[in-house]
Amino acid sequence: MALTQERKNEIIKEYARHEGDTGSAEVQIAVLTADINELNVHMAAHKHDFHSQRGLMKKIGSRRNLLRYLRNTDIQRYRELIQRLGLRR
């Protein structure tokens, strides 16, 4: 259910702004998006898993806050990121 370390490292390499970047908003949003997508698949098969549902809602809230931060600080990076991730904003 959780992302494997290899998959997480791939995402970090793809969205990092510089070498060793693991904490930028883009990387955090990309990792959360991958987690959210996996949890959505899990929730489709396990509709009554309320503990996972709560975790999904917390991850969505965290991603929303990071997206808001990025939009307010650098609108161009925000637009590029949502296009790359395929988010509906």
Curated annotation (Swiss-Prot):
UniProt keyword RNA-binding present: yes
CDD domains found in the cross-reference section: Ribosomal_S15p_S13e
A Gene Ontology term for the protein's cellular component: cytosolic small ribosomal subunit
PROSITE patterns for this protein: RIBOSOMAL_S15
InterPro entries recorded: Ribosomal_uS15 (IPR000589), Ribosomal_uS15_bac-type (IPR005290), uS15_NS1_RNA-bd_sf (IPR009068)
GO biological process: translation
Entry's Gene Ontology molecular function annotations: rRNA binding; structural constituent of ribosome
Keyword list, A-Z: Ribonucleoprotein, Ribosomal protein, RNA-binding, rRNA-binding
This protein's record includes keyword Repressor: no
Family assignment from sequence similarity: Belongs to the universal ribosomal protein uS15 family.
Functional description taken from the UniProt entry: One of the primary rRNA binding proteins, it binds directly to 16S rRNA where it helps nucleate assembly of the platform of the 30S subunit by binding and bridging several RNA helices of the 16S rRNA. Forms an intersubunit bridge (bridge B4) with the 23S rRNA of the 50S subunit in the ribosome.
Subunit structure, as described in the record: Part of the 30S ribosomal subunit. Forms a bridge to the 50S subunit in the 70S ribosome, contacting the 23S rRNA.
Name this polypeptide is given: Small ribosomal subunit protein uS15
Gene (UniProt): rpsO
